[in-house]
Regions:
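ABC ATPase C-loop
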Residues: 159-160
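Walker B catalytic motif
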Residues: 171-172, 179
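Q-loop/switch helix immediately C-terminal to the Walker
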Residues: 90, 96-110, 123
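Conserved structural motif at the start of ABC-family nucleotide-binding domains
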Residues: 6-8, 21-23
Length: 220
C-alpha cells in the first residue's frame, strides 16, 4: 500500500443507541481506489457517514485517522475542509440554491477565499461538458426536479470541482441505466487522473467496477 491517507481502527458506531459497526478496521492509501461491498443492512453507509462526521452516527470507541491526524472528534465541516467528500445515495433537494451557487460556496469554504466569478463559471462549464451535462443545470435549484441519473451526475460534478483528497461514493451506481453508469464511471476515472485522490466506493453491485481499476475490495 502507498502512504496511508485513511486509517480506521477498531471503530464502533451507534445510531440511536443501537450499535451498527462492531470494530471495523480499514486502511486506504493515497491515490488508491477501494471498494466496500456487502448486502444491505451491513453498515456500509454507516461507515461512510462516520468517516465524514455525521452527528447522527456516534463513534463510541476506536479512531479515524486522516492524513496522519486523528479526526474522530472533528465536526463535519472541518473534515470537509481537510478534503473528505461524500456522494450521497439519495441526494437531498435544496430549493432556492442553484447547483452553481452550491458548488461555488463549497469551494470558497474549502479555500477560505472568494472566487472570481468568470473563472469559476468557465471551469464549471468545462467540467460539466466532460460529464455530458447541459449548462442549464448549473442554474437550476440543487437536485430539484432532477432524475436519479442527473442527481448522481451532479454529485460527480461536485467531486470533480472540489477535488477532495478522499471521495466516498455511496451506492453511486444504484438505480442508474447503462448510459448513466458509463458517465459516472468516466467521472470517477477523471477524478483519479486529474487529482490522484483516493476513492472509497460503497456498493452492492459490480456494474461501476467493470470500468474502473480497483486496488482493494472489502466485504462487510
Amino acid at each position: 500500500m502507498k502512504k496511508e491517507l485513511l486509517k480506521i481502527q477498531d471503530l464502533h458506531v451507534c445510531v440511536e443507541d443501537k450499535e451498527i459497526l462492531h470494530g471495523v478496521n480499514l486502511a486506504v492509501g493515497q491515490d488508491e481506489t477501494h471498494v466496500l461491498m456487502g448486502p444491505n443492512g451491513t453498515g456500509k453507509s454507516t461507515l461512510g457517514y462516520a468517516i465524514t462526521g455525521n452527528p447522527a452516527y456516534s463513534v463510541t470507541s476506536g479512531s479515524i485517522l486522516f492524513d496522519g491526524e486523528d479526526i474522530t472528534a472533528l465536526p463535519v465541516n472541518e473534515r470537509a475542509k481537510k478534503g473528505i467528500f461524500l456522494s450521497f445515495q439519495n441526494p437531498l433537494e435544496v430549493p432556492g440554491v442553484t447547483l452553481s451557487a452550491f458548488i461555488r460556496s463549497a469551494l470558497e469554504q474549502k479555500t477560505g477565499s472568494r472566487l472570481r466569478l468568470w473563472d469559476f463559471k468557465k471551469r464549471l462549464r468545462e467540467t460539466m461538458a466532460l460529464l455530458d451535462m447541459d449548462e442549464s443545470y448549473a442554474e437550476r435549484d440543487l437536485n430539484v426536479g432532477f432524475s436519479g441519473g442527473e442527481k448522481k451526475k451532479a454529485e460527480i460534478l461536485q467531486m470533480l470541482m472540489l477535488e477532495p483528497k478522499l471521495a466516498i461514493l455511496d451506492e453511486t451506481d444504484s438505480g442508474l441505466d447503462v448510459d448513466a453508469v458509463r458517465t459516472v464511471s468516466k467521472g470517477v476515472r477523471l477524478f483519479r487522473e486529474r487529482t490522484h485522490g483516493s476513492l472509497l466506493i460503497i456498493t452492492h453491485s459490480t456494474r461501476i467496477l467493470e470500468a474502473l481499476h480497483v486496488d482493494a475490495a472489502h466485504v462487510m
